[in-house]
């Protein structure tokens, strides 16, 4: 029996009069890769932004329903604490342009005013750059700008920055959509290794990517969760006709 780390219950969300998510109910498995899949505008990104409460940074945003992280309502947590537990990596690599590679890895600590001894800082930087297979590529230029790296390297740096805070869940919003094929493969291989220690939720409309790396797939359409289950079953014998049509390329 799988462990559930996240439970979304009777959840609705939107902006002003626009309802984006409608009655979402889903339980996310611990230390697995779950892909939120569906056509553009279906609500995938809104859903992951709700999971770490970035959604509510928009003044017009609203939600109702519950999201539980290991049994505790995320809406009763301090957002800063929640976002350490539930980290986010965005579609476009976004290392802080004014920070070095070294400082980018430590950005979560710097922003939150957490003081560390040099030995601890060095350990965190090396450990997390190694986790994303970037250490050997940058160890001799740690004090150059993160923005000087290639696109794929920048995205791995952003993942290292998120991992440095030891999150329980890693959210990724189309993390390879702006990368070349080689960098995409590197990120996918990385995620398969990382799931040993962190639960991964990835938003993608790339069906091939979801089939390569996901353990579980949630198909979202027009703001509703149409189908959810083990990836192999979703891809080989979907229960819903809309899921089947999406997977066969009839719309997207």
Question: Model features per residue range: what roles?
Answer:
Residues 166:
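Conserved catalytic motifs of ABC-family nucleotide-binding domains
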Residues 69-73, 118-140:
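Conserved ABC ATPase "signature" region
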Residues 185-196:
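Helical segment within the ABC ATPase nucleotide-binding domain
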Residues 144-149, 153:
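Conserved ABC ATPase signature
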Residues 170-173:
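Catalytic Walker B motif of ABC-type/P-loop ATPase nucleotide-binding domains
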Residues 99-108:
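Short coil-to-helix segment of the ABC ATPase nucleotide-binding domain corresponding to the Q-loop/switch region
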